[in-house]
A protein has these predicted regions:
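Residues on the solvent-exposed faces and adjacent turns
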Residues: 5-7, 17, 23-25, 31-33, ...
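Long, compositionally biased low-complexity repeat segments characteristic
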Residues: 1-2
Length: 210
């Protein structure tokens, strides 16, 4: 299943009800918007496939937006889930994958009120050029059953590079957790706020602010 959308006046790909996409092989969503969200999943939506790929670009909204306070987005992939965009925002979601990779290139990322479970590796990479955080986690339960959890945040302005903002659980009991944050000015490289728990065979934290 392949969906491609482009918009200059709203959301490019917009699933706002109860949508179910099932594919034996791949689900690929690609969106571009200059005034809204490139990919917008709001409501009770379920995507199931071997591989799920979301790619978005937006100049004034979220490149990838999975959020709804009254609904839940569910993503199930036996192999890989890959998300890439200028900003990636994941809220109120349940995600299961073999491997999970997120790359936000301009305005950071957020994972909150979400359960993310991967059989193997989880890689979160995000850069922010504004006051927002690079990798931002809050009320998130992130588990790698047999692999590693890696978060790499970069803040070029006054945002926080890698920010765990409370009620975050990172569990890689059979692997390692590696958090890296590169901040700028008064911004933190790595910031822990509230109650957070990290569990792994090895944990490495590397923070820098220049």
């Amino acid at each position: 299943i392949t969906l491609t959308g482009s918009s200059t006046s709203g959301n490019a790909i917009n699933l706002t009800g109860t949508a179910t996409l099932n594919a034996t092989n791949n689900i690929t969503l690609t969106g571009s918007s200059t005034s809204g969200n490139a990919i917008n999943l709001k409501g009770n939506n379920t995507l199931t496939a071997s591989n799920i790929t979301l790619t978005g670009e937006s100049t004034s909204g979220n490149a990838i937006n999975l959020t709804d306070t009254t609904g839940t987005t569910t993503l199930n992939a036996t192999n890989n889930i890959t998300m890439q965009g200028t900003r990636v925002q994941i809220k109120h979601s349940n995600i299961t994958a073999g491997n999970f990779a997120l790359n936000a290139t301009v305005a950071g990322s957020e994972i909150s009120n979400t359960t993310l479970t991967a059989t193997n590796n989880i890689n979160l990479t995000a850069k922010t050029n504004s006051a927002s955080s690079g990798v931002y986690l809050k009320d998130a339960r992130i588990t790698s059953t047999n692999g590693n959890i890696t978060a790499n945040g970069t803040a070029t302005a006054n945002g926080k590079a890698t920010h765990l903002d409370g009620n975050v659980t990172l569990n890689a009991s059979n692997g390692r957790i590696k958090l890296t944050g590169n901040g700028h000015g008064s911004a933190s490289g790595i910031l822990f706020a509230g109650n957070n728990r990290l569990t792994a065979s090895n944990i490495a934290l590397t923070g820098n602010s220049t």
